[in-house]
């Protein structure tokens, strides 16, 4: 089944959170026409939400009655797949994504009629908008808790009976085997001597075998495990563009070598040009201290990255992603943008277009609003000056 990013606004093909592509099917005629969401149970599983919540959200969104019958979910009326997908995006935004980190790893916690998000990705707990009509339905129909206590108790209760049956079966098998064999012992002096020699030989062999097992096997097993770990570690390092670039940076390459590496990474992972530059920024800036230092000292390298196709957009998206992952950088985002602007790496047009059209993180947008206001004011003043000069001439 084809899959799509849970956040459809994220174009990164390596985005880890996926769900099935929504499938709709129109049934009936006239007043009885309805649209069936064929794979809603699978989508609900991918989102870790009750399918009834999604159906109810569609009912509210389209102002149409929903129907649930034998795990078949439908909405009265005829709707295109794109319209259903857009409504699903709204549901995901309001009732799945964490309001802090924007990852879909949340669960509902209902306390005294108030629903809160608990995010497994960032650990934050926060309330959701209780004004939406769906919240009252969720409170009345809370998520089903999966309890393992009953199944555990049943298993414990069955253990004595299972053990008893095993013992009974083993005893029966032993009795059957004994019935089929006739045992006798040669009591002659020669036979007794041979049995004695064989017993001594078997004991010696067993001791030697045990010593060999103790001294050799753990060492070879350990070496084998170490080799496996090294192979797995190497595979993980190259599993995504950022890791691939980070590994290459450990060789201290020249700027031109890094540019060539970015070209090969783009081809290897099938990235857009802006996504490649974004990955480069993420790899080059590993923490808040390095990020600020990097912006101030690596102007030449940043200019080279900016000259790549869509490189300026990639730089902005990269710093946005860094701020989303590390909130300590949020207080420095305006200074970072100012340095990039003053150094001629980014222009007013680049920054304003990113801010108004491409930026996705509300936290980052809010954090740099003062700088954007200053930039827009400066742009207006510059336009006024140009108009005055034209009037004078």
From Swiss-Prot:
PROSITE patterns assigned to the protein according to its UniProt record, in alphabetical order: W2
A GO MF label: GDP-dissociation inhibitor activity
Sequence ranges of Acidic residues compositional bias: 224-233
GO cellular component, one term: cytosol
Keyword match Zinc-finger: no
Keyword Protein biosynthesis: yes
Residues that hold GTP according to the record: 28-35
Record region (Disordered): 144-179, 217-247
Purpose of the protein: Catalyzes the hydrolysis of GTP bound to the 40S ribosomal initiation complex (40S.mRNA.Met-tRNA[F].eIF-2.GTP) with the subsequent joining of a 60S ribosomal subunit resulting in the release of eIF-2 and the guanine nucleotide. The subsequent joining of a 60S ribosomal subunit results in the formation of a functional 80S initiation complex (80S.mRNA.Met-tRNA[F]).
Name by which UniProt lists this protein: Eukaryotic translation initiation factor 5
Species annotation: Dictyostelium discoideum (Social amoeba)
Top-level taxonomy: Eukaryota, Amoebozoa, Evosea, Eumycetozoa, Dictyostelia
């Amino acid at each position: 089944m084809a899959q799509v990013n849970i956040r459809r606004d994220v174009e990164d093909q390596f985005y880890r959170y996926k769900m099935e592509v929504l499938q709709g099917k129109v049934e009936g005629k006239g007043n009885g026409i309805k649209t069936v969401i064929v794979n809603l149970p699978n989508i609900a599983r991918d989102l870790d939400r009750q399918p009834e919540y999604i159906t109810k959200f569609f009912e509210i969104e389209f102002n149409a009655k929903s129907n649930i019958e034998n795990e078949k979910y439908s909405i009265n009326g005829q709707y295109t797949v794109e319209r259903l997908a857009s409504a699903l995006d709204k549901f995901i935004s309001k009732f799945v994504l964490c309001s802090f980190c924007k990852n879909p790893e949340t669960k509902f916690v209902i306390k005294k009629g108030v629903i809160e998000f608990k995010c497994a990705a960032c650990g934050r707990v926060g309330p959701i908008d209780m004004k939406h009509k769906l919240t009252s339905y969720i409170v009345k129909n809370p998520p089903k808790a999966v309890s393992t206590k009953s199944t555990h108790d049943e298993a414990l209760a069955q253990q004595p009976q299972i053990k008893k049956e095993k013992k009974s079966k083993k005893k029966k098998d032993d009795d059957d085997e004994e019935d089929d064999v006739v045992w006798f012992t040669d009591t002659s002096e020669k036979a007794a001597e041979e049995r004695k020699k064989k017993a001594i030989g078997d004991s010696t062999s067993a001791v030697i075998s045990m010593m060999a097992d103790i001294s050799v096997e753990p060492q070879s097993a350990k070496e084998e495990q170490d080799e496996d770990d090294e192979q797995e570690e190497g595979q993980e390092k190259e599993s995504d563009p950022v890791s691939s670039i980070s590994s290459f940076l450990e060789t201290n390459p020249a700027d031109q070598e890094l540019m060539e590496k970015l070209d090969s990474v783009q081809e290897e992972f099938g990235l857009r040009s802006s996504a490649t530059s974004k990955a480069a920024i993420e790899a080059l800036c590993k923490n808040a201290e390095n990020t600020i230092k990097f912006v101030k000292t690596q102007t030449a390298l940043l200019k080279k990255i900016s000259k790549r196709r869509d490189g300026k957009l990639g730089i902005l998206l990269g710093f946005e992603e860094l701020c989303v992952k590390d909130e300590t950088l949020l207080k420095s985002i305006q200074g970072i943008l100012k340095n990039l602007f003053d150094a001629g790496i980014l222009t007013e047009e680049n920054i304003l277009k990113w801010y108004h059209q491409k930026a996705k993180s509300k936290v980052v947008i809010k954090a740099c609003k003062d700088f954007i206001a200053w930039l827009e004011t400066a742009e207006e003043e510059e336009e006024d000056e140009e108009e005055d000069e034209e009037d004078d001439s």
